[in-house]
Curated annotation (Swiss-Prot):
Residues 1-29 form the signal peptide. One of its GO terms (molecular function) is endopeptidase activity. InterPro entries: ClpP/crotonase-like_dom_sf, PDZ, PDZ_sf, Peptidase_S41A, Tail-specific_protease, Tail_Prtase_C, TSP_N. It is found in: Cell inner membrane. The keyword Acyltransferase does not apply. It is an enzyme of class 3 (hydrolase). GO terms for biological process: proteolysis; signal transduction. Belongs to the peptidase S41A family. Its EC number is 3.4.21.102. PANTHER family: CARBOXYL-TERMINAL-PROCESSING PEPTIDASE 3, CHLOROPLASTIC, TAIL-SPECIFIC PROTEASE. One of its GO terms (cellular component) is outer membrane-bounded periplasmic space. Transmembrane segments: none annotated. It comes from Haemophilus influenzae (strain ATCC 51907 / DSM 11121 / KW20 / Rd). This is Tail-specific protease.
Length: 695
């Protein structure tokens, strides 16, 4: 079967699942530095075929979600592979997809079982040639400065958009993309000559990256289309990626401590390592795009279109050296440059820390837990002794941004706050349920307890928070958690008898599911706060329930446990504390400013198009800067600091106050007062009862 499509200059090309380019490229003023013949698909290796076969066997036999690898599932893998290769649906034509689907749509199941990668490589080959064509067209648009005064718009999120029907449709999408790139640089006060040079280099670099494609890259993307179709936490790591991953979790690795992800030509921050320079800076956030990297001195290098591993190597470096990142914020606005000092990710930076704060005359303790590392419970035990010695009247366990860790530590930590009993239930792929219990019959801390959470609290954090909530042991404050209630394990695809076999990569796949002691899963729903804070992390953008194929929420029978807190007492306290909390933040200038910022964020999140009119975009950016400058200067005034004249004058080492924690401490102080009043009332009631009985 042949595929037919039109190209520029009305040239008609016929190809066997490929794209003809060589004679169809007109003579543009800005030319690509590479020819179509320079773009070639790497050869399929025997190792890749063996890795595919073994990965397929393990995923179909050992995954928690039992799947049937048939024609229907093959179609789903096909769709996800196309999506992985063309996330914004601006590279493939619909005719490409139709042709590829007809040939391979229902064949991937058989090929995977056989270790056959022909479909994966053929589809990737079409993508490479189409991408070359798109960037060649993008370069042609740099021939002259475009008109940025019209009413053109760019579609912000094309994840669910249809593929372009024709080359003309694809060109319209790239017209918009190039204009947007130009506007983003123009907003940084770049002249047209600078913009043209920068984008010429960027687009040619993206083409050059195509020539650097390795077979491992294709296999990893393809097998991840298969793995992620089963569930979002199942993945395949190529030998090179697995090696990098192992290095990244080695605490001696020197860098800034970020986990990055790549979509199309963009690299963004997926998560921040607790205690690492990026997290400590408070200036980087998941979703932020990295568009440039520079060292302590010299130019910032444009990294749009870079390979992920190349960018990682650029960011890593010796302890004490500086790296500069040019960031496009996830929440919008113009790019900014952030300077970080590379450092080792030290275990002491990830360790639990204890602080005290006097609030309304009450001594409030806070234990910040960045992760559930091995040895956490022993560390917290020591902190609880200090807490008792300092006569703390309430404790806040801060689990914000804590993505989890060791299950054993989540269970043991819970045991410090209850006498004994079940903490979490785990069900495996064979429906066997195991109850993890605290059985030491001792309770280290018996005082007033709060657990602080947010959208990035996940896994082990959710286990601890859920246990405290189900036992009525503590009050949960903050934002609904992430909702990751599954357990993964990593397995090398090399077998013990593979004596001379080169590395085949690693498979991470889901094997179990977590359940609360009340029987409900933490999966998808997470843990809801008893007292809610504003959604500073957008729940409509981040969370397990945003994944299109996450495992469903369900429940199993409740474990046998006894609530330690009085239901009516806790509910009454929550109602009173929440009322005070809402009244307070309604007047707090930090929360008022935050709510204004969140209103803008939510409005922009919901809009589907972005203007390509430079004056309109500049006016919006100027308005954003003016609003943020006003908020900063009002804060500085309250702090007795000198006002800023420009938002760019903000010191690089400036750290914003943690007013969420300050409010949590005020809630804790309210609870101390409430609890004291209740005891007085009970004592008075008992005294009155005794007096009445004597009469």
């Amino acid at each position: 079967m042949v595929m037919k499509f039109k190209m520029s200059k009305n040239v008609i090309c016929y190809t066997w699942l490929s794209v003809c380019l060589s004679s169809a490229i007109p003579a543009f003023a800005v030319q690509p530095t590479l020819k179509p013949s320079d773009i070639s698909i790497p050869a399929i290796s025997e190792e890749s075929q063996l890795a595919t076969k073994r990965a397929t066997t393990r995923l179909t036999q050992s995954h928690y979600r039992k799947i049937k690898l048939d024609d229907d599932f093959s179609e789903k893998i096909f769709d996800r592979y196309i999506k992985n290769l063309d996330f914004n649906h601006n590279t493939f034509l619909q005719s490409d997809i139709d042709e590829l689907r007809q040939k391979y749509g229902t064949k991937l199941d058989e090929q995977l079982n056989q270790g056959d990668l022909s479909a994966a490589f053929d589809i990737y080959d079409v993508m490479m040639k189409r991408r070359y064509e798109r960037y060649t067209y993008a370069l042609s648009l740099l021939d002259k400065e475009p008109d940025l005064n019209g009413q053109d718009q760019i579609e912000i999120d094309r994840e669910k958009a249809a593929a372009p029907q024709t080359e003309a449709d694809a060109n319209k999408l790239w017209d918009a993309r190039v204009k947007n790139d130009i506007i983003n640089l123009k907003l940084k006060d770049k002249k047209w000559s600078e913009i043209k040079a920068k984008l010429t280099k960027r687009y040619n670099l993206a083409i050059r990256r195509l020539t650097q494609t390795k077979a491992d890259d294709i296999v990893q993307i393809y097998l991840n289309a298969f793995a992620r179709e089963i569930d979002p936490h199942t993945s395949y790591l190529s030998p090179r990626t697995a090696k990098s991953f192992n290095e990244s979790i080695n605490l001696s690795l020197e860098g800034i401590g970020t986990t990055l992800q790549s979509e199309d030509d963009e690299i963004s921050i997926k998560s921040l390592v607790p205690g690492a320079p990026a997290e400590r800076s408070k200036k980087l956030h998941p979703g932020d795009k990295i568009i440039g990297v520079g060292q302590a001195t010299g130019d910032i290098e444009d990294v749009v279109g870079w390979r992920l591993e190349d960018l990682v190597e650029k960011i890593k470096g010796k302890k004490g050296t500086k790296v500069r990142l040019e960031i496009e914020p996830a929440k919008g606005g113009k790019s900014r440059i952030i300077t970080l000092v590379r450092d080792k990710v030290r275990i002491e930076d990830q360790a639990a820390k204890l602080t005290f704060e006097k609030v309304s005359g009450k001594n409030i303790a806070v234990i910040k837990i960045p992760s559930f590392y091995i040895g956490l419970t022993e560390d917290v035990k020591k902190l609880l002794v200090k807490l008792e010695n300092q006569k703390a009247e309430a404790l806040i366990v801060d689990l914000r941004e804590n993505g989890g860790g060791a299950l054993t530590e989540a269970v043991a930590l819970s045991g410090l706050f209850i006498t004994d009993g079940p903490v979490v239930q785990v069900r495996d792929a064979y429906q066997r349920i195991r109850v993890h219990e605290d059985d030491d019959a001792t309770q280290q801390y018996k005082g007033l307890l709060f657990v602080m959470i947010n959208r990035y609290s996940a896994s082990a954090s959710e286990i601890f928070a859920a246990a405290m909530q189900d036992y009525r042991r503590g009050i949960i404050i903050g934002q609904n958690t992430f909702g990751k209630g599954t357990v993964q394990q990593s397995r090398s695809l090399n077998f013990i008898y593979d004596l001379d076999q080169s590395p085949l990569g690693v498979l991470q796949y889901t094997i179990q599911k977590f359940y609360r002691v009340n029987g409900g899963s933490t999966q998808l729903k997470g843990v809801a706060a008893d007292i809610n804070f504003p959604e500073i992390i957008d729940a409509k953008e981040y969370g397990e329930d945003k994944e299109d194929n996450a495992l469903a929420w369900d429940k199993i029978p409740s474990a046998s446990y006894m609530e330690v807190g009085n239901i009516n007492y806790i509910d009454n306290a929550v109602n009173i504390l929440n009322e005070k909390h809402l009244a307070r933040i309604a007047k707090d200038p930090e929360f008022v400013a935050l709510n204004e910022e969140l209103k803008v964020r939510n409005e922009r999140r919901d809009r589907k198009f972005l203007s390509l009119n430079y004056k309109m975009r500049k006016a919006e950016n100027d308005k954003d800067d003016a609003r943020r400058l006003k908020d900063l200067n009002e804060r500085f005034k309250r702090e007795g600091k000198k006002a800023l004249k420009d938002i760019d004058d903000l010191p690089k080492d400036y750290e914003a106050p943690d007013f969420f924690l300050k409010e949590a401490e005020k809630i804790a102080a309210d609870f101390v007062i409430f609890n004291s009043d209740q005891k007085i009332n009970q004592a008075n009631g008992l005294s009155e009862a005794k007096t009445e009985s004597k009469k």
